[in-house]
């Protein structure tokens, strides 16, 4: 499974390489 880097869009916490999937202005993004 591929993971998303910080600043990239995500749909769940498990998708993020580091940090968590959090709600931002434009949907959800990975933030550490």
UniProtKB/Swiss-Prot annotation:
Location in the cell: Secreted
GO CC, one annotated term: extracellular region
GO MF assignments: toxin activity
Superkingdom of origin: Eukaryota
Expression across tissues: Expressed by the venom gland.
InterPro entries assigned: Toxin_29 (IPR012634)
Keyword annotations of the record: Disulfide bond, Knottin, Neurotoxin, Secreted, Toxin
Disulfide bridge positions per record: 3-17, 10-21, 16-30
Principal place of residence: secreted
Domain notes: The presence of a 'disulfide through disulfide knot' structurally defines this protein as a knottin.
Family: Belongs to the neurotoxin 17 (21C2) family.
Function comment: May act as a neurotoxin.
This protein's name: U3-ctenitoxin-Pk1a
């Amino acid at each position: 499974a591929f993971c998303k880097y910080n600043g990239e869009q995500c749909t769940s916490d498990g998708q993020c390489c580091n940090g968590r999937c959090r709600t931002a202005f434009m949907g959800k993004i990975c933030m550490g």
